[in-house]
């Protein structure tokens, strides 16, 4: 694990694995998790790629940063690429990370071969809901969310209790700084890229979870219809589809990336 300093002078925790001179792929975690959620994908893809994972600001080992916007989340990715001297990469983000992917596709397309937008939406939930959740987390901590999160993250078909990565990911929510979580909630409250995503020209993969109650298949269909050079894959999973269906997720991503090079 290395630490890079972003343009705001704050620290981001980054992990680089795989082949030094291979094409780079960078993964961005969901709200309330950390870089470790990508373990199955890293294990598979590091045989042929330079694989970068990082803790989104306010999560894991990365600094909590006040007044965060989705633009800030995306600019952190550019700062990581710059620090690692990577001119261009594939990008895959899930949920909040998917919103980051969309922003990068709109405003920084020259830095990416492709974006993958997993279990996300051009607008996730609503402003009032996010701000209310942020206030509640600041006041009461994350314990209430931890107790119910499995109902949103995983489907009833998935035995999350006996899946080591699912348990570790739930634990990462329990250890996420409340202020970092709340800052991300407020960023998502303000984020709406619905009208801008038509501008995306680079190859885009949209992955939706058939049982996802948070970012629905309809959200995925909307993005696929708006983004010209895009395709949609629906996976039998809930919100964290890369953990619930790791092999299928990785295979879908690999085939998409393979079709570009």
Each language-model region and where it sits:
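Catalytic histidine-centered segment of alpha/beta-hydrolase-like enzymes
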Residues: 237-250
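Active-site loop/oxyanion-hole signature of alpha/beta-hydrolase fold enzymes
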Residues: 36-43, 52-92, 251
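Acidic catalytic loop of the alpha/beta-hydrolase fold
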Residues: 210-215
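Conserved HGGG/HGGXW glycine-rich cap/lid loop of the alpha/beta-hydrolase fold
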Residues: 10-63
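Conserved alpha/beta-hydrolase catalytic His-Asp/Glu region
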Residues: 125-128, 140-198
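Flexible "cap/lid" loop of the alpha/beta hydrolase fold
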Residues: 102-107, 112-144
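Catalytic histidine neighborhood in serine/cysteine hydrolases
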Residues: 217-240
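Short beta-strand/loop motif that positions the catalytic acidic residue
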Residues: 200, 206-208
């Amino acid at each position: 694990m290395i630490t890079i300093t972003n343009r705001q002078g704050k620290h981001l925790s980054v992990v680089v694995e795989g082949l030094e001179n291979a094409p780079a792929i960078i993964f961005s975690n969901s709200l309330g998790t950390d870089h470790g959620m990508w373990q199955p994908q890293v294990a598979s893809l590091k045989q042929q790629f330079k694989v970068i994972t990082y803790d989104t600001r306010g999560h894991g080992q990365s600094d909590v940063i006040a007044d965060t916007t989705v633009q800030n989340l995306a600019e952190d990715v550019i700062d990581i690429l710059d620090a690692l001297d990577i001119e261009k990469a594939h990008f895959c983000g899930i949920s909040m990370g998917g919103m980051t992917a969309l922003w990068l596709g709109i405003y920084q397309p020259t830095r990416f071969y492709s974006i993958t937008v997993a279990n996300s939406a051009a607008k996730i939930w609503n402003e009032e809901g996010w701000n209310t959740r942020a206030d509640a987390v600041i006041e009461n901590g994350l314990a209430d969310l931890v107790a119910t999160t499995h109902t949103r993250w995983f489907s009833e078909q998935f035995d999350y209790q006996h899946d080591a990565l699912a348990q570790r990911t739930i634990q990462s929510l329990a250890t996420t700084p409340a202020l970092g979580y709340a800052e991300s909630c407020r960023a998502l409250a303000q984020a709406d890229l619905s009208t801008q995503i038509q501008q995306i020209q680079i190859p885009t993969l949209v992955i939706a979870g058939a049982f996802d109650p948070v970012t629905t298949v309809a959200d995925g269909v909307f993005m696929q219809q708006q983004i010209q050079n895009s395709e949609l894959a629906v996976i039998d999973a809930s919100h964290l589809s890369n953990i619930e269906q790791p092999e299928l997720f990785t295979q879908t991503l690999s085939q998409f990336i393979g079709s570009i090079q």
